Amino acid sequence: MDAAFKKSFAPEPLAVTDPVPKYTGLAPETTAFDIDGVIADTMRLFVDIARESFRIDHLRYEDITSYNLEECLDIAPAVIDAIIQQIIAGTHAPQLHAIAGCCQTMARFGRNGHPVRFVTARPEADVIRTWLENTLPLGAGQIEVVATGSFDAKATVLRSEGIHIFVEDRLETCFLLSQAGITPILFAQPWNRSPHPFREVSSWEEIASLLAE
């Protein structure tokens, strides 16, 4: 989930015509991560806010089958917008949690003190950077966050940073990254279950098994 995650601005997935770049393992020098839906359990926070602030008790995590929330949820668009604004601004009462296993794997990933890079389509980085600093077991100054404000801008940022591998939960973004020569790893979620040609992980334990030694 990212800045405008209730709408999907990317084009329909295109067939990948070029071979996927060779996968060589995850290392801080060449690997970066999306935040919402990969590090942060943001869609579960969406469900919690809907229940606690708007008394929407029927919504389940598994009901979120599209990044365009208006397509898959029987909730008024104004309520969806209000929940999203709470998430982006960090004004929500329920707590935003890390996805299970993330913290342990991040401790290993950043153990040598290298910067760990995160790229999000949120419109600004301050709120989520503070959350990352308070949540992840990384050293002071290791966390680097770029907020692009759009899904389409991720590839440009990643290429400029020398990133070759990106862990992402939005399938449309994976297609865009692949077309730009970046190897996406799809973090499996209910909203990305369409067919795709990419490497996929369903847990942080799987990501841990892919780390470069």
Task: Describe every region a protein language model picked out.
Residues 113-114, 163, 182:
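Short phosphate-binding/catalytic loops that engage adenosine nucleotides
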Residues 91-98, 102-132, 147-148:
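Substrate-recognition element of Asp-dependent hydrolases with the DxDx(T/V) motif
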Residues 6-84:
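Active-site neighborhood of HAD-like aspartate-dependent phosphohydrolases
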Residues 119-167, 171-175:
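Substrate-recognition "cap/lid" segment bordering the active-site pocket of phosphatases
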Residues 3, 8-11, 16-20, 155, ...:
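Asp-based, Mg2+/Mn2+-dependent phosphohydrolase catalytic module
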Residues 40-42, 47-48, 125-128, 155, ...:
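Short catalytic/ligand-binding loop motif for oxyanion handling, primarily in non-cytosolic enzymes
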